């Protein structure tokens, strides 16, 4: 009987030991995978920023290009002024969920359907020999199915679009998902964000923008609600609750 008990104890000991070892292995692998996923997310974001900045790679890797040409800065959206803080580690999405670091938008203000807006935003200055060449603005707004996240590169006049890219969205492939199509995005190049009265003027036009339009781009075929989402994204982020105050300072030449 004692021998049977000893055998059971040994078996249980082996099982418990194996379970602990497996648990440690799984936990270690999960932590390693999470770190790798974070690193990949940072690299992907940097890649999109370098792309929309129009930087020639010249055989260099993305992190090297980002470090050489891109300067992240924090902007107080209320005043449009640069503010202190670590722009490289600041998480704007997380800040927008924190009541102390964000504001709730009224239905009238929330044209992009984002609900809350962080008090501080990251902008990316594209520099060449310490002179700012462009500024990249992160914008997001609700499409048909998803929140759509974009980077918009603007010339130092604070008004002319240099490039745009959508780096995260979940719209219908072949329809709203065409926000990522380069031929559609290229329509934004050279468009003016504001009219002569400094009011947001970008228009996503259903059926197609008039040829030579200074502010208009074609709506996405078969994706009216996604197109509306793009329109509302620009309406919000170019306005007083978005980058409006900051871009006014850019227009006044405060970048250089």
UniProtKB/Swiss-Prot annotation:
Composed of six subunits; NqrA, NqrB, NqrC, NqrD, NqrE and NqrF. Keywords: Cell inner membrane, Cell membrane, Flavoprotein, FMN, Ion transport, Membrane, NAD, Phosphoprotein, Sodium, Sodium transport, Translocase, Transmembrane, Transmembrane helix, Transport, Ubiquinone. The lineage of its organism: Bacteria, Pseudomonadati, Pseudomonadota, Gammaproteobacteria, Vibrionales. NCBIfam families: nqrC, PRK05346.1-1, PRK05346.1-5. The keyword Flavoprotein applies. Its EC number is 7.2.1.1. This is Na(+)-translocating NADH-quinone reductase subunit C. Its cofactor is FMN. It catalyses: a ubiquinone + n Na(+)(in) + NADH + H(+) = a ubiquinol + n Na(+)(out) + NAD(+). One of its GO terms (molecular function) is oxidoreductase activity, acting on NAD(P)H, quinone or similar compound as acceptor. It is a single-pass membrane protein. It is found in: Cell inner membrane. This reaction is tightly coupled to the Na(+) pumping activity and specifically requires Na(+) for activity. Inhibited by korormicin and 2-N-heptyl-4-hydroxyquinoline N-oxide (HQNO). NQR complex catalyzes the reduction of ubiquinone-1 to ubiquinol by two successive reactions, coupled with the transport of Na(+) ions from the cytoplasm to the periplasm. NqrA to NqrE are probably involved in the second step, the conversion of ubisemiquinone to ubiquinol. One of its GO terms (biological process) is sodium ion transport. The gene is nqrC. Its main location: membrane. The chain crosses the membrane at residues 12-32.
